[in-house]
């Protein structure tokens, strides 16, 4: 299997399976001298960790990360950073009934056809369990971005099923299990999830992620545009079926006079473009949204077939998230951080000495 790495200067490579011994990652390209301990990563890992609320999977993994290399006396050395998280709460027997069955909507069929075999225990490498290492690597990037360049990244759930956030209160995001910014909708979310779990079904969600303090100039046109790499990274998250930058698909109904971000010496008047113009960061906040499909691991019976091509009915056992979007916020933050970190280092390598006479614009 290829495709386990992302980035050019800041490179993150992950390994491991859902029910394997451990998950791990290697980070190449992190600058030396960054103060780094396990605690710097643990906060975001705890935000993603399973079993923390009644709305997520009952699988309980401590997700305690260990630094294996690349850090000496509390600081990064500039060499490869090795990270490891052990799996401790696997129940592989829960998946014995699908050993020879393909779960509709999952990667079972495509993995079998591509590799001639598959790890049926929790989906193996295709499981979102792998994203724990992305979150750990993203936490390293987030610390460097904030500490050295004052770039901050935050995400929130903007929609769960039919329930949309109508107000954005950033102080609310970490105060509830949904990472939802609208406190007036929490009761409705709780009731909706209760009924959903009773029915044995699942639901999709929309996650928004924003980066502030991003300098103008990040992005490498033509094929390594900043928004293209952000979309690539976010689309690589399990269950993501759509990505928007700025107004995204909303631009279809906009007129040019409405969607352009007017500017003056005092700054931009709007940010319909989501902080990227011509594939290069404009200095405005980077704004992206992702749509996550409902998980197909549900207890509602569904038609499928066996590995031998015979018709069969599938009921997925095991412990699963009724809405995978609930734990996707720190994952989306991590992927955006990894892309920005990579592009920041690439920009520094080529354009560090560039001095433009044009004033840098902010938001009015």
Swiss-Prot record:
Disulfide bonds: none annotated. FMN binds at residues 125-127, 238-239, 278, 293-297, 319. NADP(+) binds at residues 48, 54. One of its GO terms (molecular function) is FMN binding. It comes from the Bacteria. Pathway: Metabolic intermediate biosynthesis; chorismate biosynthesis; chorismate from D-erythrose 4-phosphate and phosphoenolpyruvate: step 7/7. One of its GO terms (biological process) is aromatic amino acid family biosynthetic process. PANTHER family: CHORISMATE SYNTHASE. Belongs to the chorismate synthase family. This is Chorismate synthase. It comes from Shewanella putrefaciens (strain CN-32 / ATCC BAA-453). The gene is aroC.
């Amino acid at each position: 299997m290829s495709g386990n790495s992302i980035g050019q200067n800041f490179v993150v490579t992950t390994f491991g399976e859902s029910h394997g011994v451990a998950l791990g990652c290697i980070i190449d390209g992190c600058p030396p001298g960054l103060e780094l301990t396990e605690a710097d990563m643990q906060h975001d890992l705890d935000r993603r960790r399973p079993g923390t609320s009644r709305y997520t999977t009952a699988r309980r993994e401590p997700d305690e990360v260990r630094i294996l290399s690349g850090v000496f006396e509390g600081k990064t050395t500039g060499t490869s950073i090795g990270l490891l998280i052990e799996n401790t709460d696997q129940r592989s027997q829960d998946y014995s009934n699908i050993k020879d069955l393909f779960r509709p909507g999952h990667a079972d069929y495509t993995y079998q056809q591509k590799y001639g075999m598959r790890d049926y225990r929790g989906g193996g490498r295709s499981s979102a369990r792998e994203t724990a290492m992305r979150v750990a690597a993203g936490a390293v990037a987030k610390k460097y971005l904030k500490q050295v360049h004052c770039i901050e990244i935050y995400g929130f759930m903007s929609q769960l099923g039919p329930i949309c956030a109508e107000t954005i209160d950033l102080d609310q995001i970490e105060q509830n299990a949904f990472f939802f910014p609208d406190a007036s909708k929490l009761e409705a979310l709780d009731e909706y999830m209760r009924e959903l779990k009773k029915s044995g079904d699942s639901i999709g969600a929309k996650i928004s992620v924003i980066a502030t303090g991003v300098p103008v100039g990040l992005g490498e046109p033509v094929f390594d545009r900043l928004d293209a790499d952000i979309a690539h990274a976010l689309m690589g998250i399990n269950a993501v079926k759509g990505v928007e930058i700025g107004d995204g698909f909303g631009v279809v109904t906009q007129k040019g006079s409405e969607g352009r971000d007017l500017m003056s010496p005092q700054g931009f008047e709007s940010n319909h473009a989501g902080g990227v113009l011509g594939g290069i960061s404009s200095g405005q906040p980077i704004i992206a949204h992702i749509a996550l499909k409902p998980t197909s691991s549900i207890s509602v019976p569904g038609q499928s077939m066996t590995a031998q091509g015979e018709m069969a009915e599938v009921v997925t056992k095991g412990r699963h998230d009724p809405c995978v979007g609930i734990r996707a916020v720190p994952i989306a933050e991590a992927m955006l951080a990894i892309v920005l970190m990579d592009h920041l280092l690439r920009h520094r390598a080529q354009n560090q000495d560039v001095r433009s006479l044009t004033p840098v614009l902010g938001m009015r």
